[in-house]
């Protein structure tokens, strides 16, 4: 493994990212685990290609905390997929849910996801952003690993390998990976795609705001009726 210097101060992140771009994803993970702040954790949606990051991180940190935000509206296949990967990879899974149930929210606000972009944003804040923010704070996560990739959407093309968010470092070790890189890693390690992958679902979130990819559609149009790609977690935290 390449020997790397200790984490530089915030004003040197640009230099650090230039250096990290030359390393493998494995070495980026090892560097972050060694030099990043305490209490590392990986957030996972248990989506289409989530097995890659779960496998990559647990190779080097078998007991790393894995955070799943259960909105209450995930696909049944997602819950079962989470069970499968948790058993196979012996995941230290922590599930966080909204402070109020979906029924509570619907009774007071209706189906927010059907109320245009403002309703979608409010829904995402209540059911995704708040639970993730609470998880990171309660678990005192200092180094937050994500599976963000630049090729996933137009909103992620500038994703850095390491970012500073408040007092936390956010690490995206496969930021530069292509779909081909993902496929090769999964094939090499015999990892499963999400069960809905074979039905054309390439980005999998909640059951009411996710649709399969169709001809002439962009991947990011399969979420939130094409209004937006991001759920707010990686925009606001």
Swiss-Prot record:
It is an enzyme of class 1 (oxidoreductase). The gene is cysH. Its main location: cytoplasm. GO terms for biological process: hydrogen sulfide biosynthetic process; sulfate assimilation, phosphoadenylyl sulfate reduction by phosphoadenylyl-sulfate reductase (thioredoxin). Belongs to the PAPS reductase family. CysH subfamily. It comes from Xylella fastidiosa (strain Temecula1 / ATCC 700964). PANTHER family: PHOSPHOADENOSINE PHOSPHOSULFATE REDUCTASE. The active site is at residue 231. Catalyzes the formation of sulfite from phosphoadenosine 5'-phosphosulfate (PAPS) using thioredoxin as an electron donor. It comes from the Bacteria. It catalyses: [thioredoxin]-disulfide + sulfite + adenosine 3',5'-bisphosphate + 2 H(+) = [thioredoxin]-dithiol + 3'-phosphoadenylyl sulfate. Its EC number is 1.8.4.8. This is Phosphoadenosine 5'-phosphosulfate reductase. GO terms for molecular function: phosphoadenylyl-sulfate reductase (thioredoxin) activity. The lineage of its organism: Bacteria, Pseudomonadati, Pseudomonadota, Gammaproteobacteria, Lysobacterales. Signal peptide: none annotated. Pathway: Sulfur metabolism; hydrogen sulfide biosynthesis; sulfite from sulfate: step 3/3. It holds the Pfam family PAPS_reduct. It is found in: Cytoplasm. The keyword Cytoplasm applies. Keywords: Cytoplasm, Oxidoreductase.
């Amino acid at each position: 493994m390449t020997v790397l210097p200790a984490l530089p101060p915030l004003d040197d992140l640009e230099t650090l990212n230039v250096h990290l771009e030359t390393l493998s994803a494995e070495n980026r993970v090892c560097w972050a685990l060694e030099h990043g702040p305490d209490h590392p954790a990986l957030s996972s949606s248990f989506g289409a290609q989530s097995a890659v990051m779960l496998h990559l991180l647990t190779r080097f940190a078998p007991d790393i905390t894995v955070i799943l935000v259960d909105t209450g509206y995930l696909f049944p296949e997602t819950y079962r997929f989470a069970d499968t990967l948790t058993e196979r990879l012996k995941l230290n899974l922590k599930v966080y849910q909204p402070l109020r149930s979906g029924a509570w929210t619907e009774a007071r606000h209706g189906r927010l996801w059907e109320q245009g972009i403002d309703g979608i944003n409010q829904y995402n804040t209540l059911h995704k952003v708040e639970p993730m923010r609470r998880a990171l704070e309660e678990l005192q996560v200092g180094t937050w690993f994500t599976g963000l990739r630049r090729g996933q959407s137009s909103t992620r093309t500038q994703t850095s390998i390491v970012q500073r968010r408040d007092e936390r470092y956010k690490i995206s070790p496969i930021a530069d990976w292509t779909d081909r890189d993902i496929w090769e890693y999964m094939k090499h390690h015999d990892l499963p795609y999400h069960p809905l992958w074979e039905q054309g679902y390439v980005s999998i979130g909640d059951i009411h705001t996710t649709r399969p990819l169709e001809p002439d559609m962009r991947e990011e149009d399969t979420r939130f009726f094409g209004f937006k790609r991001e759920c707010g977690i990686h925009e606001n935290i």
